[in-house]
Amino acid sequence: LPENVFAYDLRVNLQTGNWNILAEYAQKQQDPNEWNDYIYRKGYVAMLSTSYSKSGMSMLVQAKRSDNMGYRSMRRLPLSAQNTSYINHLPAFTMDHTYALAAHYPYATNPDGEWAYQAELTYNFKRRTLLGGKYGTKVKVNFSHVHSIEQNPHTLDNGMVQGSNGYGSAFWKWGDSKYYQDLNVQVEKKLLKDFKLNLMYMNQYYNKTAVEGH
């Protein structure tokens, strides 16, 4: 097994006017461990994020593909410590909920690999308009979708996956499993000087078997 695992990250951030574009690519070298069945496939994450903002409106569109990017300081851990020893952080491209019911099933990035997308639009209707009313109205729409990546198994001559490159994966192709999907519409409306109304519609899909393994 490799004694050291080299990793690097490249990031480019462009900003012009009201636009901001962020592109990032990270890769780790061969890192066989118990979570990837001791395969020698390299891991990587490619991410693109675009945002636009002006007075009263903002927009965000993101896409990310990760592949075999679980990265820990230990190759094996006891069952009581399976969620420890992470070196890298893989943020989820999903909305961070604050209300208890909506936050009941938070999503965590699948280190084996995934395609993740997120889009968000926020708009403030001005005061003293038909939809803004006396105090204005804020509307936010968020949509996120996370899907597995295609994985075509590679094996050694003896049929074993361990010690091989693990699998092949075409960059743009999805796998068979949808991990998570979330649609949220939020309306924030101030009715009186000291009284505000918050309304939210949520449609959430959570694949517990794929995400939690049970």
Give the residues covered by each predicted segment.
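Exposed, low-structure sequence patches enriched in small/polar residues
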Residues: P2-H214
